[in-house]
């Protein structure tokens, strides 16, 4: 039970905010930042997963919950001596998501209906969630997914079958973190 997903979500959000705002003067497009944010969240997932591989149940939940809290406090206090996250005020003036000339922040008309910026973001995030669900279903039916299921059912038997449980569990942490970072 991993309760640290809020930390991976925060890492992905701050990567986007830092790379798509005037805070550092970098204005990269969303499609460039998305894999960068997922990769950095994946790195944080491996950093959390490596020391916690032997924990189970309540102990794993407590450690991952603590990790989420550590990341929150760290990001809130990362404004001195170098202002990276602007502290509790956060990063402002983040660029809206654009696909070509189509901006998700502006109201537009489609088939005579007015679609506001928040509605466009909603439909975009639903589409992104559907893509993530499809990827997860495909992963579940793959060799890696079967290894995850074998480890869940009986870790000793999975080891006896030749599954490298340490690497597969670390991959599970990393993949979950990357999806959280998206």
Task: Give, region by region, the residue ranges found by the protein language model.
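Transmembrane alpha-helices and adjacent helix-loop boundaries
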Residues: 1-182
